[in-house]
Amino acid sequence: MLNNSHLLIIWLFGLISGFNLMITGNTLNYWLAKEDIALQTIGILSFITLPYSINFLLAPIFDAVQIKYLNKIFGHRLSWICLTSTALIFLIYIFSFLDPRTNLVLFTFTALIISFFSAAQDTILSALRTEIVPKESLGFTSGIYIFGYRIGMLLAGSGAIYLSIYFTFNEIYKIFAGLVFIYLILLIVAARYTNSFGLVEERICHSPSFLCHSRGSGNPNNEFFIKRYYSNFLKIFLDSRFRGNDIKSGNDISLAYFIILILIFLVLYRLPDNLINVMINPFLLHLEYDAFEIASVGKFWGVVGAIIGGLVGGFIMKHKNILNSIFLFGIIHALGHILFIFLEINGKNSLLLFITIGIESITGGMTMTAYIAFISSLCQGKFRATQYSFLSSMMGISRSIFPIISGYMVVNFGWQNFFLFTTIITIPSLLILLKIKTKLQ
């Protein structure tokens, strides 16, 4: 039975996940733009968030591997959280002394390592959340988690840009390190007080390794579990709802073709947003908006708009099926990108910025809601968690790899053509969606 203390822990999970993502994501992007780093370089550095795209590969390790000393004190899950949080505290503090203008290579490498530990912790927290929460309460607690996630994004995103009016980003990242430390203490205290982590310890497997030890003679099945997870990963994915009557032609070639279509769609559908997200900070600074305006409208209002869009999208999807919704939302959202062209033509205009960010964020929240619902609808059977992790990683690939060309596009073709491209590139994904729809009907 869940109580308020358990809900607080779920909220803390979301808070730190959203907070950590922004540290190496949009906030870092703003820092680089503020330091007048070349647009091409800013685009390339979008790959820093790549660990979030492959974190599903780490999941079996965190399930099976037991940390030698920390496990005796904190237990299995909490010991991993302590390890990753401690690493993040030290790495973020070290990062706060680096300057992207004088040593960009070391700056980038450190940010990538921070991103790795952030993604690792995100994986652990996601697994723990599903273990603490009863199945019938997952929907409600997901809302608590997402609320915490958005608050974390606001703190490390809009909050950091507000602080940049008074502090340097080196000082701000020192504050970040302190906040991660405070979070760790709060989580340890809350976990000990509620014994939430103890509820799932007996369900966790352990395995000996050079980083860990086993209780007694250990469990030799854990090494087999990890090897089996990786060797059969594609089989796990293929043995889903895609077999059988869900595809008109049930042969393997048709199955492979259908899966490829889905993967391409998942990458392309999110690509326009991901291109814009990498360049939005340089764009707003190019239009000479100050830190207060960017934090208030570009970030805070953007998050509020995304929340509103998620609610609107969820309401509409009660009356329309997922495929029709994701198609409709995609068209509306693509048209919203055109407003950035008007913003570039008109120059600095606070009202137009408010309207542009509002429409972009609300329609973006709608598409994201439908996108997640679509991924969830594809996952069935006993391996649905693995399927979901794999499919959602396509969103991460779209966010981390393809936007590396965004800076080159702006430099060579200009802002207006860049935003026009983000509108047009939606068309291929919608055509693929129509093809997927015919396959499923």
Swiss-Prot record:
Transmembrane portions of the chain: 5-25, 42-62, 78-98, 104-124, 143-163, 171-191, 249-269, 297-317, 325-345, 352-372, 390-410, 413-433
Cellular compartments annotated: Cell inner membrane
Membrane topology: Multi-pass membrane protein
Major location (coarse): membrane
Protein name: Putative transporter AmpG 1
NCBIfam families in the record: 2A0125
Record's keyword annotation contains Protease: no
Annotated SUPFAM superfamilies: MFS general substrate transporter
GO molecular function, one term: transmembrane transporter activity
Listed GO CC annotations: plasma membrane
Disulfide bonds: none
